UniProtKB/Swiss-Prot annotation:
Pfam families: Arrestin_C, Arrestin_N. This is Arrestin domain-containing protein 15. Residues 344-374 are annotated as: Disordered. PANTHER family: ARRESTIN DOMAIN CONTAINING PROTEIN, ARRESTIN DOMAIN-CONTAINING PROTEIN 15. It comes from Caenorhabditis elegans. Belongs to the arrestin family. One of its GO terms (cellular component) is striated muscle dense body. Transmembrane segments: none annotated. InterPro entries: Arrestin-like_C, Arrestin-like_N, Arrestin_C-like, Arrestin_domain-protein, Ig_E-set. GO terms for biological process: protein transport. SUPFAM superfamilies: E set domains.
Amino acid sequence: MPEVSNGRRPSVATFLRQFASTIIPLVNVKQSMPTTQINIVLAEPRCMAGEFFNAKVLLDSSDPDTVVHSFCAEIKGIGRTGWVNIHTDKIFETEKTYIDTQVQLCDSGTCLPVGKHQFPVQIRIPLNCPSSYESQFGSIRYQMKVELRASTDQASCSEVFPLVILTRSFFDDVPLNAMSPIDFKDEVDFTCCTLPFGCVSLNMSLTRTAFRIGESIEAVVTINNRTRKGLKEVALQLIMKTQFEARSRYEHVNEKKLAEQLIEMVPLGAVKSRCRMEFEKCLLRIPDAAPPTQNYNRGAGESSIIAIHYVLKLTALPGIECEIPLIVTSCGYMDPHKQAAFQHHLNRSKAKVSKTEQQQRKTRNIVEENPYFR
């Protein structure tokens, strides 16, 4: 507080001059620019659990006097679930660490010359790591943090890079009947005031119920509508069901929440009353970025906070809904010879189907072009 002369308070101009004399030297201080930049190059866009994660850390330095105090790469994988129960206002949240490891990229005291430098990184991902996943009620995130502590603040820096991890699963892990053809049949009775109004018969045929990510599911749907009303908005859907589990903060009580996500849908149109229709070659593709089925065959009692399942659902109005559970793996067969034979069998089946269709098209064209049949 400046001294008061003659009992008078200092003017506003005096305060402004004092403030300017204090702040101007701070503004004139030149901000130093960083002298290092960090980036990474991945060997693959995603890594499989149980395998080695390989990457290269790229360091670009413009300061010849940079001395490394510590230079490390840290990989973390954390799963989190959480929500608020709207009825009880209880908060449920759970956190689980799947991987937390750190490696040194170079020794302390190393002098980095000007230029670009590469540091290889190889870390084994645990076999039980679940797939990367993002949703409203939970997530499984993996990240790689590269931190450089150097002799100067301008040379010290850190960067965080997200990683994509995929659960390791094969066709060898699924039950044998999942690789066999299946015919799913169901009937829906419509009654009103105990009076029968007819029945709708549903039939879905699949070559198998186990697929790997990136494959297409081919289904044949047959609907026999024996009612007096037509069916509307008939559709075949590929649904991913996710079950989350979290624990309350104070009572330590577990609660589960189920969410559904539409992956792909094939609209089939409508089915008239007292009519039988067959829909062939309904193709639904499993995206390459979709996580495989998770926690479907663990028999050791280990529970996952995020479990992922897939179903093939047939829906129609009014009130028709039926599901076939599916298994989605990240890989085919573990044995490469067995996988090659399986792929050869699929190619032969597709070739036979395409040849039959071609013959049918030729026969139809000959009949249509013959003037005798016009």
